[in-house]
């Protein structure tokens, strides 16, 4: 049965802290100047600069100062200076059935799909009002009916010995096949998938789909709930995944920069990276 109500939003996550345009800064500073305060525990997404070190890093002052002011505004309003796009990796992740008010696509998809928490994909600016009031519109994935799979995706011919690269590829392709609806993925029940694998699926899925969650049979807690009566079916086979892999690896051979951490790496991933590669700072 439905477990959420608009009065039970327990925590928030702010995504409007990125300096995407001047409106983000103007909105935050105006609200802070008016005395706005969050009333529920609220984390802050990754921001546009290293708040402590952007000057030493040579960031343009006009940009760095504005980006830092934007972050400061949300801290001044009582948000926790977490500065991560993976708040579910912090020490107190949401529980199954907990109603939260999060923004940022991978965080929302992971919370709904893997943790079984409930949140809309809260847009910028509204994320602050949710944090200020502890209330959110009761619709969509807050309700049982808004969490049903509307497309069943059968995975065919997938070997059991997949490596780490499989999971983001799967999420990217699944999103392509369910760009506007919640899917249920079947056929992966025998695969081993930990936190990092699920994080990779959710983040990549959010880059190609607007849906706020997905179900994976054998891996996510609500995969057994009844699908929507009108749910249709599609198949993703091994060759389709191979085609996508080739598409994603079609760039030039010369590489100037490798950027990692979108979303932020877990401690496990950071340790593995540090132990197997020479880190150049």
Indicate residue ranges for each PLM-predicted region:
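Extended, H/D-rich, highly charged conserved domains that either
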Residues: 162-219
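Short, small-residue-biased leader/transition segments that mark boundaries at the very start
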Residues: 2-5, 273-277
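Active-site cores of enzymes that catalyze phosphoryl transfer or operate on phosphate-rich substrates
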Residues: 202-238, 248-250
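Intrinsically disordered, low-complexity linker/loop segments enriched in Gly/Pro
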Residues: 93, 125, 131-163, 167-169
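A generic, well-ordered mixed alpha/beta core segment in the N-terminal half of proteins
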Residues: 44-134
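N-terminal basic/disordered segments at the start of proteins
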Residues: 1, 6-34, 119-123, 130-135
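Glycine-rich phosphate/ribose-binding loops and adjacent secondary-structure elements
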Residues: 228-272, 281
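General beta-strand structural signal in soluble alpha/beta enzymes
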Residues: 9, 38-42, 81-85, 118, ...
